[in-house]
Amino acid sequence: MRACALLSLLLTALGAPAFAGVMDGLDSLPAGFAPRLEKIVAAKPAHFVKHGDGCPAATDACTEKAYLVPGDLVIVLGTQGDDVEVIFTGGAPRFRSTRGWLPRSALAPVPAAATPAWVGRWANGDDFIAITPAPGGSLAFVGSASWGGGDPARVANGGVNVGAFDTTLAPRGASVTFSPSADDGKPATLDPKVDSDDCVLRLWLLDPYLVAADNGKCGGMNVTFSNVYRRAPAKP
């Protein structure tokens, strides 16, 4: 059985939530935040570690049942003591994301690609960001996200909230910050801490993941693009 399937089964048994947006929004991220890609290199399964209520500690009570296996790739958000906070997102069709703590000794950095490969369809559930070549060496970014689509009553009553963007960018490197709703119709690099009605997004390419964080103004109520997306097959 694949590692992501094992993890999904374990987390279901534990009652862990499937996050609609597992990433924090831009306003909550610390200055200089830079997620990185790392790989499980431990010789045995790396169990998640509890934090809080007397944990972490070298006890069974502080060890989660859920685990990852050698070769699994995670997004590292930060470090606390001997542990790192990570996000693991499985593949299609569920794209289940899990956020938790792992022993730092179980991970090793993955070298960044020499040339960022932005082009592709990046998905998490029904939400997606599609990136395609555009004239002049730029890239077209199209995104769609929703909230409430899993509630049949909301669907029947038209109560599903949505968000979308469509813009053209020329990223330099493996991250980009932009506002698709800038007044002049052109993408702009904005300070996410500035109070603005404009939608602001920041993307980090950590292949096979695309990490996104927005300022909470990119769609209807509760809609967010703040998530971890994985490469997915292109829509026919």
Predicted regions and their residues:
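Bacterial N-terminal signal peptides
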Residues: 5-15
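N-terminal low-complexity, Pro/Thr/Ser-rich intrinsically disordered segments
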Residues: 21-45, 118
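Short alpha-helix capping/helix-loop boundary micro-motifs
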Residues: 53, 57-63
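Tryptophan-anchored aromatic micro-motifs
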Residues: 111-130, 225-236
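N-terminal glycine/threonine-rich, aromatic-flanked beta-hairpin/loop signature
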Residues: 127-182, 212-222
